[in-house]
Amino acid sequence: MKIGILSQDIRLYSTKRLYETAVERGHDTEVVSYLRCYMNIAKAKPRIFSAGRELSFDSVIPRIAATWTFYGAAVVRQFELMGSVSANSSAGISRSRDKLRALQLIGNTGVEMPVTGYGHFSRDVESVLKSVGEPPFVIKLLEGTQGRGVVLTETMDAAISVIETMKKIDANILVQEFISCLLYTSPSPRDS
């Protein structure tokens, strides 16, 4: 089977292991930087290229970074249109990065979750915050990952200030109630 691993860098551990495993199992495998791919979109003949060479794979394994979701998903979609089977679909990649959609779906199931506010925040920031509850608030960028773009605000004024600042960069913002928890620590041997 001809497999394309779509990654930014062969040196990434996960990419390297996928490549090694595929080769060990006898597959014709290539790592391709999806950021260097470009597409030809024409009637009934989707094509994709990298460095002037047309690409074709039986299967692709996407390793798309969160910061490149839109472009990476477009590359995966082009391979899908060409008949390649993808380990993660382009739609799945896009949906997995959409925090708002995930929260809307989870909220509709009855699963316990923090009260979340989302709005354009063009005028009435305080009303959106009040719809969530009382401070403290957790303010999140929709596009942030792994804790980036997350701010805990202790007061209403601090929350308004953070949102006003984020609005200046046209960021999409979620506001959530803060749920405190007590961390359990096991007794130390000295306490026995």
What are the roles of these predicted feature ranges?
Residues S7, R17, T21-V23, V32-K45:
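N-terminal beta1-alpha1 cap of cysteine-dependent amidohydrolase-like domains
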Residues I3-E20, T29, F49-L55, F79-G83, ...:
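Active-site nucleotide/adenylate-binding loops and adjacent lid/helix of ATP-dependent enzymes
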Residues L35-E80, A91-S96:
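N-terminal glycine-rich "phosphate-gripper" loop used for MgATP/nucleotide binding
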Residues A22, V60, S186:
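A residue-level signal for conserved active-site and pocket-lining positions in enzyme catalytic cores
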